[in-house]
Each structure stands twice: as C-alpha cells, then as structure tokens.
C-alpha cells in the first residue's frame, strides 16, 4: 500500500500507517518523508514494521509511477480539506482507502475506493484486507478522475457559474 504526503505527521495518519505496517501481510510505502524520518523509520526501532520510507520524488513522472505500481493508496488523513493525493491516485488507476475527513469522501465512489470513519484503524485495516482480496477495476479509477476532476471541465463549469452570476 502507498501513502503520499508533502509533510508526514500524525495529522496525515503517520501513526496509523505505523500500526498498519506491523501486520506481516502489509507492506507500507510512504513517499515524502524527510531525511530524518527516512533514517528513523529505517532504524532497528521499527524492525517489526513492514515500512519503506521514501523521500520526495524528483518529478511528477516518478510519483505517477509509484501510484501506478501500488495496489492501494491509503490516505488516513485527519486534517485535509480536499486532498489532491486521492485525485492523483485515481488518475493513475490506483484505488483509494481514506478516512471520512473533509472532502476526502467526495473524490471516490464504491467503484474506486472505500471510506472509513476517521481514526478507526481497525476498519482501515479491514478495508485494506478486503480490497487486496477483491481488487476493483483500475479503469474505474481513471474514468472517475477524467469525468469528475478534469481541470478543463472544471474550469468550464467555473466560467459558466461566474457568467450566470454576472448576468443576474
């Protein structure tokens, strides 16, 4: 499973990922770790964790490759309004499991991911297990990203809205 953040903290679900990584069936790859975090989470202190800490990628291509290679993108955020990491995962054909936080649930539907209650790590782990056992179609993720979050279509809707407001 993949987690991506610009800055990793418990607000971004870091502690929950540590819990998930203690299950021998899970391998957790976290992208965006600082140098200090890479060193810390690679140390013997975390030897019971299946955790692979990675620094920020060098470009969008590297990041999209990581999303595309992942079975699942997990976003156990506690403090996001509408996280772009969910949209990035969908655009790369990767399913999303996220907490019911801010706009996270709006990015996905029942064909593209699962939403669990914020802070319920057991439900998060169960959703990961179920999705591994019964993967969803990656094409459904790409389709949702293109149909719902294409910037060209979104810009057109904004322009139409602004025009309707100025014509009143």
Predicted region positions:
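Nucleotide-activated donor-binding/catalytic signature segment of Leloir-type glycosyltransferases, i.e.
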Residues: 32, 39-58
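Short alpha-helical donor nucleotide-sugar binding micro-motif in glycosyltransferases
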Residues: 65-70, 158
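A short hydrophobic beta-strand element within the catalytic core of glycosyltransferases
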Residues: 73-74
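Short hydrophobic beta-strand element within catalytic cores of glycosyltransferases
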Residues: 95-98
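Conserved acidic donor-binding segment of nucleotide-sugar-dependent glycosyltransferases
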Residues: 110, 114-121, 130-135
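A short, well-ordered alpha-helix in the C-terminal region of glycosyltransferases
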Residues: 136-148, 157-160, 164
């Amino acid at each position: 499973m993949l987690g991506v953040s610009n800055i990793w903290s418990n607000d971004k679900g870091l502690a929950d990922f540590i819990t998930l990584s203690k299950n021998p069936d899970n391998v957790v790859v976290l992208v965006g770790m600082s140098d200090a975090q890479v060193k810390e989470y690679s140390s013997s202190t975390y030897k019971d964790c299946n955790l692979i800490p990675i620094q920020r990628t060098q470009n969008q291509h590297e990041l999209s490759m990581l999303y595309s290679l992942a079975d699942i993108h997990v976003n156990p955020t506690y403090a996001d309004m509408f996280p772009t990491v969910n949209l990035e995962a969908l655009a790369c054909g990767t399913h999303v499991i996220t907490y019911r936080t801010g706009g996270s649930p709006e990015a996905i539907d029942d064909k593209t991911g699962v939403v669990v209650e914020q802070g319920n790590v057991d439900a998060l782990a169960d959703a990961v297990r179920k999705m591994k056992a019964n993967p969803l179609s990656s094409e459904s993720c790409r389709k949702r990203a293109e149909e719902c979050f294409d910037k060209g279509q979104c810009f057109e809707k904004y322009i139409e809205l602004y025009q309707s407001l100025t014509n009143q």
